[in-house]
Amino acid sequence: MKRSNHTGKRTILYLIIAVVALMPALVPPAATAHETSAGSVSHHARGSRSVVSSAVLAEPAVIGSAKAEGQQEIKQPARSRIAIIVDDFGNDMRGTEEMLELPVKITVAVMPFLSTTEKDARRAHEQGFDVLVHLPMEPKQGKPEWLGPGAVLTRMSDAEVRKQVEAALDNVPFAVGINNHMGSKVTGDERVMGIVLAVCKERGLFFVDSHTNYRSVAGRMARKIGLPPVENHIFLDDVHTASHVVKQMRLVQERALNQNYCIAIGHVGIQGKETAAGIRSGIAETKDSVEFVGISELVRDEWQWNSQLTPP
């Protein structure tokens, strides 16, 4: 009897050991981080780029990709970006050289029908900078002589508005778009802005609302016809000192880091050298945390803008 009991206990012990050894095969593995981190990949409202959370530790399959079996490489998100537009080129204004010598990409907005319009546009293009037509547009207030030649006015007929816009585009080579010089009255006028935007669309261009009018209809109307609603966020030189421009550049950096990008506007002109000096100092402070790009690159990525540009 003792031998039988001893043998039975040994058999039970062997069975327990066998069950323990088989347990890893019977219990399903824990889920990986990317399967349990809901919302760890979030898309910006513009639909341009993805921000991948640090919680995503494993590489997920990409549905619909040719490399859907875990072979798709996840790119790290690009740095926040800043596009600086410098207005009022075209008349050899003070600060022109200093702006063109800045150590990052800028966008050069050139007024049409002036003494150095073509020269400034060509030089900017040759240096790899984007060019915009800085189109004079009627303001609510201000002296008419501030507008310059070729201005778009609300009293013009539809045909006259179209003629002015097309002539300005023909006068500024290499333009990828238009932004408004002054224009607080025009950008609030649906009829006139409808014509301006229609010409932009016909030519494969976009419109940058300088935001001289907080009741501007430009963005809303651009969306309606399939154009990107691009707008200025911060004026750098609303106070004409280099120290103020540096402060504004810090605001630009803050917005870019919080919102993924920022568009800012400065000017050549009476205080153009001071503005350029402030921008240069601001670049030195911010260049390690953001990327400076031309407006066309920003528009292409943020709004998936792939329209074919009309050659000069």
Name each model-derived stretch:
Residues 146-170, 187-192, 219-256:
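Alpha-helical scaffold elements lining the catalytic groove of polysaccharide deacetylases
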Residues 82-86, 104-110, 131-135, 178-180, ...:
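Hydrophobic faces of well-ordered beta-strands that scaffold small-molecule active sites
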Residues 166-186, 261, 265-267:
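Active-site groove signature of glycoside hydrolases
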Residues 2-80, 249-250, 289-296:
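Terminal interaction modules at protein C-ends
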Residues 179-214, 218:
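Basic- and aromatic-lined ligand-binding clefts that recognize polyanionic substrates
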Residues 200-213, 271-312:
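C-terminal domain-boundary segment and adjacent tail
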Residues 75-145:
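Active-site beta->alpha N-cap acidic-glycine motif
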Residues 83-85, 89, 105-111, 148-157, ...:
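Second-shell loop/turn segments in exported
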